[in-house]
Amino acid sequence: MSWDQVWIDVNVATMDPSISAPYGAITHAAIAVKDGKIAWLGPRSELPAFDVLSIPVYRGKGGWITPGLIDAHTHLVFAGNRANEFELRLKGATYEEIARAGGGIISTVNACREADEAALFELGRQRLNALAKEGVTTVEIKSGYGLDTETELKILRVARELGKHHHVDVKTTFLGAHAVPPEYKGNSDGYVDLIINKMLPAVIKENLADAVDVFCENIAFNLEQTERVLSAAKAAGLQVKLHAEQLSNMGGSELAARLGAKSVDHIEYLDEAGVKALSESGTCAVLLPGAFYFLRETQKPPIDLLRQYGVPMVLASDFNPGSFPICSTLLMLNMGCTLFRLTPEEALAGLTLNAAKALGIEDKVGSLVVGKQADFCLWNIATPAQLAYSYGVNPCKDVVKNGKLVHQ
């Protein structure tokens, strides 16, 4: 057989739902890669003969291979920090109180408006490197810290450049509707007009976004405004998604389902009607345990209802300067299990196959199947559950991206 590389002495958590074993596991397995894709996958005993002297053969020493991790919700490109707000919250101030007083998102907006693209790129590169070392091979990056045309474009350009200069694939999301900027205080409808009539066309002209997002919440944008932005995005051929039901239930999830959104994110206050709507539309539920933890929230997402209705559950870091400034995707496995009571298998699916669904790329990545992109990680673990069970010593040994060994 003519392959580019072969991996043997491994166990594989394929996350392929057509395999009935937990994690879609194949033990004592082998993987062959050709032209950046998985060319063969199965038990080592069934691997066709090949010339071991002509291609690289990697021995996994009994470790586990999983699909490359996918972080489907980050705000990775930003300047400044909000450590002072961290102190205020610990003294009793709420996230909403800080935002209404001009802190929160707006303080980061001011820092991003002042930063140039080179500075933002370097900050983003360092953060992307940190995620890559944890086995992340695809990441979504949102804008939303500009809130004017120039800075929103600047953030999205930086995100696109990161994808061009890093082995991690970057999917970009335009989140101009993240908050109402100070210059539009008391005129949120006017700002929505700006998003639709000026910002979005500029984003589309430069091909800077794969999707459009809106923060649908009392402190941000109402249902009517949210629908206006997302409808304009859909009309332009972009995917849509939504921050919703984080602080209250405004019915954003039902709106997202009606619009065919790829995902609804946060959803702590999601009710059964919203869950049913997501199930019927095939919209993913993105769980963000890091923000739940960091903000010391008490309202948990309706995990049992999501299971009951078969809604794909995604885990993501929500890495951002305000509600989760901890740059770790791997930590979400443990948090998803301990805080939201996911099983380790559900948690891993949330960072692989279901995360790919949330980004609309499940035909290429998210599970290990012949013909899909060869994005995978070798972990120094005895069982896949160990990824969720333990944290602190990074067990990621090797990372393959598009068939190339990029981290060893």
Curated annotation (Swiss-Prot):
Binding-site residues, Fe(3+): 73, 75, 243, 318
Keywords of this entry: Cytoplasm, Histidine metabolism, Hydrolase, Iron, Metal-binding, Zinc
MF terms in GO: imidazolonepropionase activity; iron ion binding; zinc ion binding
Reaction catalysis annotation: 4-imidazolone-5-propanoate + H2O = N-formimidoyl-L-glutamate
Principal place of residence: cytoplasm
Species of provenance: Shewanella oneidensis (strain ATCC 700550 / JCM 31522 / CIP 106686 / LMG 19005 / NCIMB 14063 / MR-1)
The name this protein goes by in its record: Imidazolonepropionase
Entry GO CC: cytoplasm
UniProt keyword Electron transport, yes or no: no
Family to which the UniProt record says this protein belongs: Belongs to the metallo-dependent hydrolases superfamily. HutI family.
Chain residues that bind Zn(2+): 73, 75, 243, 318
Location of this chain's protein in the cell: Cytoplasm
Binding site for 4-imidazolone-5-propanoate: 82, 145, 178, 246, 323
EC number assigned by the record: 3.5.2.7
Residues reported in the UniProt entry to bind N-formimidoyl-L-glutamate: 145, 320, 322
Family annotation (Gene3D superfamilies): Metal-dependent hydrolases (3.20.20.140), Urease, subunit C, domain 1 (2.30.40.10)
Summary of the function given for this chain in its UniProt record: Catalyzes the hydrolytic cleavage of the carbon-nitrogen bond in imidazolone-5-propanoate to yield N-formimidoyl-L-glutamate. It is the third step in the universal histidine degradation pathway.
Cofactor annotation: Zn(2+); Fe(3+)
Keyword Cytoplasm: yes
Cofactor note: Binds 1 zinc or iron ion per subunit.
Gene Ontology terms: biological process: L-histidine catabolic process; L-histidine catabolic process to glutamate and formamide; L-histidine catabolic process to glutamate and formate
